[in-house]
């Protein structure tokens, strides 16, 4: 398969990538996501929580019995909701690309997921050093990380069981955005990374990409067309909204998705959102992401958000959620400017009313998740 046709009317893949750093969501929270998302057009879930050791740090090891039973149950629940469960492997740290053994290890682990019904797998090389670590890899791949990653996927593709005709593979390359923060964190990337990767990667493999930045304010059709022209493979956007991990953990991204070109489905195969660490609160911004993914041309951020709040909490709660959202946005602006939060008397009154609303619902799951921000509101 080649790149998605620019005449495509909608994203083929729509859903969530649980790909953040921090405590993974519970199985119960994931099931609630499936029910919530399936009703809003979600059809894909990529399992890739950075802090699941068997996904990343200990990826070569099988899941222990209890953990596997829970995962198998989750896979079955996804299938009941007609959601494609995508299992992500993160083998990047210390991987010896020139060795055959890691490919066989990955395929052996994938076979268990295949037996449970998984038909899409992702290999994730995000957030690892930008240069090959081992001399044998540097000799074999000409010191090119891009060539090594493409060749590794080609080896997986070639060695998978012949019966896996319905299996799809995705790749998240180490260079997943032109954001300069990537090079500062992991080292400068080789020139022509995407072109080199494209030449080595099987055409059937789709590629994940976050956009012009790791956490982009805007993603335009022009940007994704330019990336697609270099990569020449189907693109799946890994959109880091509304995620709030790492340096963003004090932020509460509950507003609507914004700044996404309504024409992106013309050039993008899939669109996945990385969610909040707080799963119950996270359903609010995700509702707007699902609205965009299902009908990008008709999407109106504020109308979608108001409808999501009303559906979840009732129309009378809308002013309180507007106040909570406004407070968090004001707090972020103040932190960025390194100054105290500045609020008008009217804004303080609205925040106090919102605080009383939160107090009335303090025993609900979402209210427990918002407790740190409620404390900040009281102190404002």
Residue ranges and their predicted role:
Residues 1-111, 115-119, 126:
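Feature activates predominantly on carbohydrate-active enzymes
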Residues 36, 77, 108-112, 155-159, ...:
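A generic secondary-structure signal
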Residues 56-59, 133-137:
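Short acidic, glycine/proline-rich loop/turn micro-motifs
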Residues 26, 63, 67, 98-102, ...:
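Residue-level preference for long, well-ordered alpha-helices that form the structural scaffold
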Residues 19, 119, 135-295:
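Catalytic-core regions of glycoside hydrolase
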């Amino acid at each position: 398969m080649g790149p998605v046709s620019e005449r495509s009317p909608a994203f083929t893949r729509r859903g969530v990538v649980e790909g953040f750093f921090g405590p993974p969501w519970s199985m119960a929270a994931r099931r609630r996501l499936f029910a919530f998302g399936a009703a809003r057009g979600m059809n894909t879930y990529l399992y890739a929580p950075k802090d699941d050791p068997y996904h990343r740090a200990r990826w070569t090891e099988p899941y222990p019995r209890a953990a596997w039973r829970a995962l198998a149950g989750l896979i079955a629940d996804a299938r009941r909701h007609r959601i494609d469960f995508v299992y992500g492997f993160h083998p990047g740290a210390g991987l010896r690309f020139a060795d055959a053994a890691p490919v066989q290890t990955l395929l052996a682990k994938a076979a268990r997921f295949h037996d449970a019904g998984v038909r899409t797998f992702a290999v994730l090389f995000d957030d690892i050093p930008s240069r090959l670590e081992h001399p044998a890899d540097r000799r074999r791949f000409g010191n090119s990380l891009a060539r090594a990653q493409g060749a590794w996927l080609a080896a997986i593709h070639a060695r998978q069981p012949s019966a896996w005709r319905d299996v799809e593979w995705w790749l998240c390359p180490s260079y997943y955005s032109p954001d300069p923060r990537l090079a500062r964190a992991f080292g400068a990337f080789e020139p022509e990374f995407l072109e080199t990767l494209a030449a080595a990667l099987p055409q059937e493999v789709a590629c994940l990409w976050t956009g012009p930045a790791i956490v982009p304010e805007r993603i335009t059709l022009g940007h994704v067309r330019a990336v697609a022209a270099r990569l020449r493979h189907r693109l799946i956007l890994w959109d880091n909204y509304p995620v709030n991990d790492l340096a963003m953990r004090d932020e509460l991204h509950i507003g609507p998705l914004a700044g996404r070109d309504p024409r992106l489905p013309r050039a993008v195969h899939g669109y996945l959102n990385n969610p909040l660490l707080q799963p119950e609160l996270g359903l609010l911004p995700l509702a707007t992401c699902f609205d965009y993914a299902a009908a990008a041309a008709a999407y109106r951020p504020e109308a979608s958000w108001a409808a999501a709040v009303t559906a979840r909490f009732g129309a009378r709660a809308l002013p309180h959620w507007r106040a909570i959202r406004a407070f968090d946005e004001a707090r972020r602006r103040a932190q960025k400017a390194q100054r105290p939060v500045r609020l008008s008397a009217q804004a303080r009154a609205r925040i106090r009313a919102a605080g009383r609303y939160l107090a009335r619902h303090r025993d609900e799951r979402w209210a427990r998740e918002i407790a740190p921000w409620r404390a900040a509101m009281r102190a404002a």
